[in-house]
Amino acid sequence: MTKKYDLVIVGGGPAGLMAARVAGENGLSTALLERKTDITQVRRTDGGILSPVNEYTFGQTVVYNHEAKKISFPVSGFSISYDGPHKDVYGFNLYSPNGNKFTFGDRVEQRKDPKKNRYGVAVDKALFLKPLLEEAIRNGVDVFPGTNVTGIEKKGDRVAVTGNGKTYEGCFVIAADGVNSRIAGLMGMNKERKFCATHLQNFWSLEGIEIPEIEGLGFIFCADKTFSVVSTCHENRFSVGVSSYRPCDDLPAALNRFVHEDKVYSHWFKGGKKTKETSCVVNMYSPMKEPFKDNVFFIGDAAWLTEIANPGALCCGWKAANAITLALMDGKINKEGIGSYLEWWHKYFYGPYGKKEIKALELQDYLDADDIDYLVGLVKEPLFGTLDFYKLIDTIGSTYGELFPTIQDERPQIMAKLLGLVNQMEEAEQEVRKAGFPSK
């Protein structure tokens, strides 16, 4: 038997749960379909960091009020409840194979006024997802966990979604099913997008360790792989991971060597206990210029290159559900009715960032350990503090652009490699795409 709703939401992450909460608050008959049986359980790689704090990304900023147990989004005008541990995040460190580093942000200055100077807040993701789910249910949303969506089609003025042999119809559908969106594949949305790479990650949760110099994120360029160390909201617990654009790479083995054998960094993890291991595989496509087709919205990660981050996903869910509410009120159950969302998406997401080229390259293919040590060691002072990925990339680019004369003078052979990399960029990108396995 077909169940009929105003709105059907596929995906119970931050974007989907926020959309469900808002749709329920607004009185829409709503169904939420989620593949996991325990919707708020975080089973894949996620650092749990909320940012931007004290800066703007995608036109938004985050305010965390520990005393009120609220995470607020003052630009959009909503908040969510959070009653759990937290830790201030002060920035980003970049390390070379032999221990050179530079930082984004000055920790000494930042710590003088943490609330004003932090760039993010580490939280327990499950503990802010849980209230969203509970509020959605209280607001009358029908929730169907353990539902694997296998089909979607337009039927007249409605959209039918099939999962586990059952059909759910809505005037609108929100696809909030993540960066590897099945709905996007079923509806042919990826055909017009550029496939960039398949990105793999493997992470361990390590308890019982202290790394005082990392109060946020650390990226470590070792001789063979790039590793990351993320400070979590829990004391003496870090998330340590490795990534690659080569699906054939043995990432667990590489991570094991880094944690237990690396001559420079393994001391960070001495005595640590591995309590959890997670992985993720992301097929990276260029962002959607228009994330809407046949009354289906694609929001959050489903419409972006990689993860749009938790705050971005929450804002997408909030905006989409409100746009659909107005469309139904105005009797415009079509693209015109939700035009406010598409304008917002283009203004804050696709317009500023959608055409930016992200180069999916393995730096170690072009530079050896000594080269990377030299380049990292050139940066003597803290750089502009931020957790905005695009600002990080721009800052690195402008910093080394100014250092090119020094590199040419001191290490002309490294400069030649850098120029060679620029000339080989297209070929390198083709190799990365060839190694991947794009979603259909």
Model-assigned labels for residue ranges:
Residues 3-32:
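N-terminal Rossmann-like FAD-binding beta1-loop-alpha1 element of flavoenzymes
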Residues 22, 35-98:
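N-terminal FAD cofactor-binding segment of flavoenzymes
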Residues 36-38, 131-266, 304:
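Predominantly flavin-linked oxidoreductase catalytic cores and closely associated redox partners
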Residues 322-372:
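Active-site-proximal substrate-binding core of FAD-dependent oxidoreductases
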